[in-house]
Amino acid sequence: MQAPLGSPDWLGVFTAAERPDLWHLARDEKVFNGLWPEYNMHGNHTASYFGSLFPEHANLQVLLVDTRTDRLVARGRTIALRWDGTMQDLPPGIDAAGLRAVNEPGQATALSALAAEVDSAYQGQHLSCLVVKAMGDVARAAGLAPLLAPVRPSWKDRYPLIPIEQYASWQDDSGFPFDPWMRVHARLGARIVSVAPRSLQISAPASDWEAWTKMTFPGDGQYVFPGGLAPMTMSRGVGTYFEPNVWMLHEL
């Protein structure tokens, strides 16, 4: 792949089909795992669709490399799915999008982002923006435009009690989204098309939640926890959390 406009001279951009060695490196050495809260690694459905990305859809996975050292510095994971372009047909979240893609192979008409990850040593260099640009390039090359993005708002954990509908409407002084990650997408031309209050589901025993959050959950109820974008509900020893996202659309 050609590096997007605005890339530093040292940046190389590849698909996982072009550099399967780096895809395996990221998986085997868990290069990006520390970027996510532990609870986020245990979605009810995520393994089924994240597990389908390679090798079946290696040409849709983006890898950013520091060519001076051949170091993998960022990754963009995407999935192809059927979408007719209407809001009625828009999946209600990332889980639904991923499961639709897995359950309806060969019917894809659009590309959905799943995750954009940047090595902590390379953050602050606008690489997340370049990952999104590269996702758009992949979508065009595969004939899968537009690019959908179920955006996980990066500051939502600061406001876990604010409904995602309200949070998504907040703007900064320049009229762009208040949330930094949403703002990255907006500055690249994306627009908000919907919110997904129950985008990703995580249900697990209280003991797991206690290990993930370093908290104690003495009884039933709703709990705010570190890194959570919304409260988690504990009932009869099982904690259920629905992570909210914001659907943003890159028309390309």
Tell me what each language-model feature is.
Residues 182:
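ATP phosphate-binding glycine-rich loop and adjacent ATP-lid/helix-beta elements
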Residues 76-115, 123, 153-178, 196-238:
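Conserved acyl-donor/pantetheine-binding loop and adjacent beta-alpha core of acyl/acetyltransferases
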Residues 148-151, 193-195:
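Short, conserved beta-strand edge motifs with alternating hydrophobic and charged residues
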Residues 249-252:
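Short beta-strand-to-coil "C-cap" segments at the C-terminal boundary of structured domains/repeats
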Residues 186-194:
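Conserved acetyl-CoA-binding loop of GNAT-fold acetyltransferases
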Residues 1-89:
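Short amphipathic alpha-helix that is part of the acyltransferase structural core
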Residues 123-141, 146-149:
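Conserved acetyl-CoA-binding loop-helix of GNAT-fold acetyltransferases
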Residues 59, 242-247:
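Short hydrophobic/aromatic beta-strand or adjacent loop that forms the aromatic wall/cage
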